[in-house]
């Protein structure tokens, strides 16, 4: 069963998001195994990120690599919302 993860950090700018993605790419862990989609949206310092994952195990493995990078960059991800996906419709 796929999972939808929704991050709504207290503050996240495009520059912070781009720096985190750059670091994840440098570490060779992004895009991660099991990550179907990542969507970043919003404006100013109120960006949000939604992801669709194949499994909780893959999400947890990625989270273990992500958390130290976010801490190093001073990004507080907040507490994500995690829900099971009922259906994904693609074009």
Residue ranges with predicted function:
Residues 1-50, 54-68, 76-91:
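Short S/T/G/P-rich N-terminal loop/turn motif that feeds into the first structured element of a domain
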């Amino acid at each position: 069963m796929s999972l939808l993860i929704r991050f709504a950090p207290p503050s996240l700018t495009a520059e912070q998001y781009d720096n985190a993605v750059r670091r994840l790419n440098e570490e060779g862990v992004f895009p991660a195994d099991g990550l179907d989609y990542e969507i970043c949206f919003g404006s100013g310092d109120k960006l949000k990120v939604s992801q669709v994952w194949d499994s909780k195990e893959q999400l947890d493995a990625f989270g273990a690599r992500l958390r130290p990078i976010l801490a190093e960059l001073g990004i507080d991800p907040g507490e994500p919302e995690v829900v099971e996906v009922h259906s994904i419709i693609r074009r």
